[in-house]
């Protein structure tokens, strides 16, 4: 079964090493049958503690779809990439949104936010007299 995954990669901060490693990760994903690959560069940041003697790293988030049985082989291939400091692969869960619940919640918020003071000082609601009520019933 094809699942949607989201992976976060931490590379060494040097530009050339980063680009080579990122290309190697993409080739590995394509080799194991990943489709719909979307890559987002997060940025270069200082690390809280050194990882493999590196004080800075570049973060990249990649979303892709792939068969679940290929994940172990992909992880074993990622461990061999030299300039990849850390990685984390998560299953991205797609949830269906209940629109009825959202509509009800929005209506309640609208109802609660109505300015109640505008109704107090304005015109009063009049009850129909006897002759007016019979006119309504005839129609």
Curated annotation (Swiss-Prot):
It comes from Borrelia garinii subsp. bavariensis (strain ATCC BAA-2496 / DSM 23469 / PBi) (Borreliella bavariensis). The keyword Ribonucleoprotein applies. One of its GO terms (cellular component) is ribonucleoprotein complex. Residues 118-139 are annotated as: Disordered. The gene is rpsF. Pfam families: Ribosomal_S6. SUPFAM superfamilies: Ribosomal protein S6 (SSF54995). Keywords: Ribonucleoprotein, Ribosomal protein, RNA-binding, rRNA-binding. Belongs to the bacterial ribosomal protein bS6 family. Residues 126-139 have a biased composition (Polar residues). The lineage of its organism: Bacteria, Pseudomonadati, Spirochaetota, Spirochaetia, Spirochaetales. This is Small ribosomal subunit protein bS6. GO terms for molecular function: rRNA binding; structural constituent of ribosome.
